[in-house]
């Protein structure tokens, strides 16, 4: 081969290695980037007046005076939307209009009976009322504008009638007038479509603005408030302005998503300007403000994490990790000390080392199985406790998982202590134990601490071992270590896969994972800093 | 007279005191000796916790799996592809699950091994120490990210992307799981094989360069062959990570227990052993057949990883011997 081709190959090879590493780093950024950036939006975001309402109702937090002033301002703007829709519905919702007319007719009949009338008068008025009712019903069912006009004019003839003054029958004329006004503007053939679309808009408005003032408060917290976040409000606005439909292109072809403007659909009606109105006044209705919601880290959440934070999850994770550290730290340090300082290199020690390595290689789900079989189903009943998964069993399981990590890190730390330290101590007459406790251990402490932090971060992120030994997705904050707990890791899993409600609050989904990752990465960063410091100190650079 | 006698007796005693560290009387020596032994044996016992743990893990997994192994023929367990534990006539055929595990692991290794070796070569032979000290912690970050976070990424980001951009019928499939698993096993592969490649001494490199070889030739013809057992150990350790991983495969593989057909179609959903344990265990009654069958899968998994672990240790000890011999 020519030397130039060889050098070309060499260059290509170098480029490939560079490329590989760049791809790996890009992957890291691609994985962390969206999770962290979307996760931050759980804490820093633009909230709306609905968020402030929710904070006061659920967490008793915020300024009530200010809020009621804001409520007043927004209510005026919102009311106009409701009024427009109600007006429009008078011309469309023939079903409910018919119902209304029937109710009025019944009421009139009752009033009529209480009046002092001759039988002849009674039958006359009664038949007129019946006539009015039937005419109106014909008008509501009709698609023909002329017919409607005819019916309504017929009905309106009686509006001046002395017999109906001050009775419920006056409502007939109000409804009739309203309906005629509305019917003039609307395309009657589209009545049905309009009714459906208005229903959708009303549902979306409930999502955006919360339940209508005066309406009964829904039972679940998630339905009691409108869009609590500005980004959410905007996406709902988009849904209000644009109608999305899956339209078929023909047999065998996949459906295609189309977007049509709702304003076009309602062209020529009194609702048409409403869309512009909502769009222009969204800010005045929602009053967005930049918020740093640090309480996300301490708040409890409503079921499904729709509102609130991840306080119990963080507490659960901390409890689990700290409790397991309580078992791991002494065991790990003593094992490492024995293996490095006291043990001779014989067969038994080799077996111990193989066991430690095997333990490090055991899949995490096996630890879960073992924890279930041993700690939950065997150990707890053996001590007379109820055999159910709890924090105690979960942390014991995790501590076995973390043991090899701890032993290895401590061994490394103890090995890096220069032998001159030990020799000096031994030469001064100290025994093996005293040398270890007063010289080697303090010198190795930063390294051991690194090991502690590394095993902490490993334990904090593990999910599989605690699946059957103490983690739950929903539940109260534990009051003792013999109860199961929510954790960040299991919560992240549950919100990504198990919970349908969580799909509606992506910021909370990402927020929990991001918190877990930040927690673990911070622990790792501390470990790295400690390690470099120790390295510098012991090697005198 | 009395005083002189005391002096005579006291004098040697004072002499002894002076040399106390060197000359102990019998009881003193015994006490210290016993103390040392006692202390050491306590330490030894505590150290044996890990051995005890391994033993207990084996004991309890086998104990829970044994009734199942007795009742069902292992032949059916390994050859039947039907995993229908809840059916009226339950079937516990683990073949599809075993194949699923192997399938994602091998696919993950196809991505991860070349990338890992290239990255290891990059770190040890291509860049300066300064770049290396920046890049290495970044790669170690990949190992620090919790597996559930990878699973989350697979479900929330990668799966929708695959479904919309690549036109797969489902985003949670073998390819998705394999990609994430390969990213997860990369740090292990990189750091172990980098250690092996760095352990090949300067002498070999310099002699190769002196003979006129380029860097690529040196690496492919000299260094990688010399470090091959370390690299094999790295691959095995990476495989262990992939085989034993639970959360990612559970979330990203689609959990359809079947053998992919056609075999090369990565866009199909599959199910692995770990995901089956994680997914089914929550719903079974303790002590039922299904429960025991899951433990049997666990036992199989444990045996596989243990064998892989011993294999990796064998290869690692070979590298240690080789590099020791070179020095």
Feature names for model-found ranges:
Chain A
Residues 338, 342, 346, 387-427, ...:
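Membrane-cytosol interface at the C-terminal ends of specific transmembrane alpha-helices
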Residues 304, 466-517:
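Interhelical loop and adjacent transmembrane-helix boundary motif
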Residues 37, 287-308, 343, 348, ...:
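Membrane-interfacial helix termini and adjacent extracytoplasmic/periplasmic loops
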Residues 1-16, 36-306:
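Membrane-topology segments of multi-pass transport proteins
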Residues 432-470:
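Transmembrane alpha-helices
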Residues 324-356, 369, 377, 528-536:
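Transmembrane-helix boundary motif in ABC transporter permease subunits
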Residues 411, 415, 419, 426, ...:
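C-terminal transmembrane helix and the adjacent membrane-cytosol boundary/short C-terminal tail
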């Amino acid at each position: 081969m020519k030397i130039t081709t060889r050098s070309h190959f060499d260059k290509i090879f170098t480029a490939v290695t560079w490329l590989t590493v760049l791809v790996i780093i890009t992957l890291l950024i691609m994985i962390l980037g969206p999770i962290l950036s979307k996760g931050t939006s759980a804490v820093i975001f633009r909230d709306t007046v609905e968020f402030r309402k929710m904070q006061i109702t659920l967490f008793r937090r915020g300024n009530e005076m200010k809020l009621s002033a804001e409520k007043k301002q927004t209510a005026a703007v919102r009311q106009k939307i409701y009024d427009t829709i109600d007006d429009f519905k008078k011309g469309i919702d023939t079903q409910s209009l018919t119902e209304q007319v029937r109710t009025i007719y019944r009421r009139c009949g009752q009033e009529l009976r209480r009046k002092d009338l001759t039988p002849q008068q009674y039958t006359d008025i009664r038949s007129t009322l019946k006539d009015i009712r039937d005419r109106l019903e014909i008008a509501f069912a009709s698609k023909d504008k002329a017919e409607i006009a005819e019916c309504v004019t017929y009905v309106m003839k009686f509006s001046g009638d002395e017999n109906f003054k001050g009775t419920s029958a006056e409502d007939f004329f109000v409804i009739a007038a309203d309906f005629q006004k509305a019917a003039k503007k609307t395309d009657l053939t589209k009545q049905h479509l309009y009714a459906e679309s208005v229903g959708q808009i009303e549902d979306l408005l409930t999502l955006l603005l919360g339940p209508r003032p005066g309406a009964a408060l829904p039972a679940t917290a998630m339905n009691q408030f409108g869009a609590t976040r500005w980004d959410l409000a905007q996406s709902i606005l988009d849904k209000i302005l644009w109608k999305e439909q899956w339209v078929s292109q023909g047999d065998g072809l996949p459906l295609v998503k189309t977007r049509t403007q709702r304003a076009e659909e309602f062209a020529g009606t009194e609702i048409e300007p409403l869309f512009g109105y909502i769009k222009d006044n969204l800010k005045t209705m929602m009053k967005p403000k930049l918020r740093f919601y640090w309480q996300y880290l301490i708040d409890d959440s409503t079921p499904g994490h729709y509102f609130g934070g991840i306080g119990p999850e963080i507490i659960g994770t901390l409890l689990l990790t700290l409790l397991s550290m309580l078992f791991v730290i002494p065991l790990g340090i003593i094992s490492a000390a024995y293996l490095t300082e006291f043990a001779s290199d014989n067969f038994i020690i080799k077996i111990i080392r193989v066991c430690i390595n095997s333990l490090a290689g055991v899949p995490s789900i096996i630890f879960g199985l073992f924890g279930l079989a041993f700690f939950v189903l065997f150990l707890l009943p053996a001590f007379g406790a109820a055999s159910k998964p709890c924090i105690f069993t979960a942390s014991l399981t995790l501590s076995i998982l973390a043991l090899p990590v701890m032993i290895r890190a401590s061994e490394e730390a103890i090995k890096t202590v220069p032998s001159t330290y030990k020799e000096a101590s031994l030469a001064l007459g100290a025994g093996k134990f005293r040398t270890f406790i007063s010289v080697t251990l303090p010198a190795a402490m930063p390294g051991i601490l690194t090991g502690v932090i590394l095993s902490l971060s490993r334990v904090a992120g593990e999910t599989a071992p605690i699946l059957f030994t103490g983690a739950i997705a929903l539940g109260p904050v534990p009051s003792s270590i013999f109860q199961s707990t929510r954790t960040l890791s299991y919560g992240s899993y549950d919100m990504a896969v198990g919970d349908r409600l969580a799909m509606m609050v992506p910021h909370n989904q990402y927020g929990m994972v991001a918190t877990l990752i930040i927690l673990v990465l911070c622990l790792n960063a501390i470990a790295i800093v400690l390690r470099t410091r120790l390295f510098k100190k012991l090697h005198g650079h | 007279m009395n005083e002189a006698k005391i002096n005579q007796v006291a004098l040697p005693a004072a002499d002894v005191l002076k040399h106390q560290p060197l000359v102990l009387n019998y009881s003193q020596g015994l006490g210290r000796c016993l103390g040392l032994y006692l202390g050491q044996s306590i330490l030894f016992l505590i150290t044996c916790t890990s051995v005890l743990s391994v033993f207990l893990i084996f004991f309890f997994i086998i104990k829970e799996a044994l009734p199942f192994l007795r009742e069902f023929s292992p032949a059916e367990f390994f050859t039947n592809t039907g995993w229908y534990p809840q059916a009226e006539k339950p079937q516990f055929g683990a073949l599809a699950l075993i194949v699923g595990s192997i399938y994602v692991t091998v696919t993950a290794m196809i991505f991860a091994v070349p990338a890992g070796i290239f990255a290891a070569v990059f770190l040890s032979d291509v860049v300066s120490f300064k770049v290396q000290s920046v890049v290495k912690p970044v790669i170690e970050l990949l190992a620090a990210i919790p597996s559930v976070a990878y699973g989350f990424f697979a479900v929330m980001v990668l799966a929708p992307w695959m479904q919309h951009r690549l036109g797969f019928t489902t985003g949670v499939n073998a390819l998705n799981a394999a990609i994430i698993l390969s990213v997860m096993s990369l740090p292990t592969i990189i750091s172990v094989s980098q250690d092996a490649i760095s352990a090949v001494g300067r002498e070999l490199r310099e002699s190769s360069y002196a003979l006129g070889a380029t860097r690529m030739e040196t690496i492919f013809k000299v260094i990688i062959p010399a470090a091959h057992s370390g690299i094999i150990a790295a691959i095995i350790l990476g495989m262990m990570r992939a085989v034993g991983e639970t959360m990612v495969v559970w979330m990203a593989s689609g959990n359809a227990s079947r053998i992919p057909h056609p075999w090369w179609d990565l866009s199909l959903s599959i199910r692995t052993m770990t995901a089956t344990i994680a997914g089914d265990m929550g719903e079974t009654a303790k002590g039922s057949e299904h429960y025991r069958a899951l433990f049997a899968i666990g036992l199989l998994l444990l045996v596989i990883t243990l064998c892989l672990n011993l294999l990796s240790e064998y290869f690692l000890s070979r590298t240690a011997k080789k590099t020791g011999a070179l020095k």
